[in-house]
Amino acid sequence: MKKIKTYENKNILILGLGKSGFSVAKLLLKLGAKLTLNDKKDLSNDDRAAELDKLGVRIISGYHPVEIFDKEKFDYLVKNPGIPYENPMVEKALKLNIPVITEPEIALNVSEAPYVCVTGSNGKTTTVMLTQRIMDHHLSKNGGHAYAVGNIGVPISEVVEKATDKDLLVVEMSSFQLLGVTDIKPKVAAIVDIYNNVHLDYHKTFDNYVEAKLRITQSQDQNDYFIANFDQKNILDRELKKTKAKVQTFSETDKTADYFIGDEYLESKDDHQIMKISDIKIPGIHNQQNCLVAIAISKLMGADDSDIQYALSTFTGATHRLQYVMTYNDRKIYNDSKSTNIEAATVAIPSFKEPEVLIAGGLDRGFMFDSLVPLFKKYVKSIVLYGETKYLLADAARKAGIKDIVIVNTLQEAVPRAYELSEAGDVILFSPACASWDQFNTFEERGDFFVKFIKELKTK
């Protein structure tokens, strides 16, 4: 870890505990900062808060003490990425011209290990996991490691102390995190895709959302690389105007891109066949595109075809992202709880050749599901719907001509009904197309319950 003086003896307010708040607090203490941590939740019985308190961090919880800015001067406010900029503490800090930063920028600025960054509306976690797997295989030959960090669930500040210049950080960045960075310079940055109707409750407009994503490349220069989706032409134009890095592209079908999906192989435009598609374990065209991004990043960071082939042929998928759960009575069952929007379901549903029994539904964000009608018509034989959006999804299913439409209240009810509708040789796919918050705290919790309910089928 680099010993920088930026935060030494600085008075810093951390807003929000959570995983990243806890980790960045410990990092900042080692960098010599004086810390106050505030969380709207009561932290009086929180073990992490108690640990920080023993280390000398002042803890203020249960409310936001906006008046604290009138009593003392802060040099920085470190904001949990999920806290909106309309938060009164953030608004007050900005009004006083106090820099508002986030954990990734602090951690990456002290990292001795080089780093690459990946963002996107869908597919970024799988891409990060694939890249980490390829690069770990490559770096291990010389005693190094690749670490998957960031929005994937492991704070960067948790890893930077042990990561050396022999290692690599593969960083997943959300739009929330990117909005709070001003000076990160990844050797390779990649945007997997950008779709509308994602996080507009936070960013307010699609244009704001795109601009947040583009911050991943804003500090890159001609010595760096930017990986862009050749098929999203409207986004590509903005990316090319924004970046100063060398650009490489990937495409589902266009052979003029640097990397593309061929008939039997993932290929590069120099007619090089990199990976046999039939050897890739994770299903779906979208996952083949994720593989292309991981290949592009890894090639630039020194990996060879053998590293790529080993990693892609042994990777069975990220949890809650078209995750294979089990085969039960000749039905293959998949958990795609990360399908929190229509676009995610759009890429999941066409991933299988077998007839599908689909389970969908969740939080109503005011979207219509008519765009799913052609996919329902082509791939879905039966559908079980639950949650706030069940009737809206049922309308789309009727338009698609699906005869077996079952409406229930909860996911627990949906699972056995889906099994009853299925036959040997079918796929049972849980791809909600909606956020989880009507019945679950997170998509991870929702996916865990789905797997639990599936396993309960075997006991009945």
From Swiss-Prot:
Pathway: Cell wall biogenesis; peptidoglycan biosynthesis. GO terms for biological process: cell division; cell wall organization; peptidoglycan biosynthetic process; regulation of cell shape. Coiled coil: none annotated. It is found in: Cytoplasm. Keywords: ATP-binding, Cell cycle, Cell division, Cell shape, Cell wall biogenesis/degradation, Cytoplasm, Ligase, Nucleotide-binding, Peptidoglycan synthesis. Disulfide bonds: none annotated. It catalyses: UDP-N-acetyl-alpha-D-muramoyl-L-alanine + D-glutamate + ATP = UDP-N-acetyl-alpha-D-muramoyl-L-alanyl-D-glutamate + ADP + phosphate + H(+). GO terms for cellular component: cytoplasm. GO terms for molecular function: ATP binding; UDP-N-acetylmuramoylalanine-D-glutamate ligase activity. ATP binds at G120, S121, N122, G123, K124, T125, T126. Cell wall formation. Catalyzes the addition of glutamate to the nucleotide precursor UDP-N-acetylmuramoyl-L-alanine (UMA). Belongs to the MurCDEF family. This is UDP-N-acetylmuramoylalanine--D-glutamate ligase. The gene is murD.
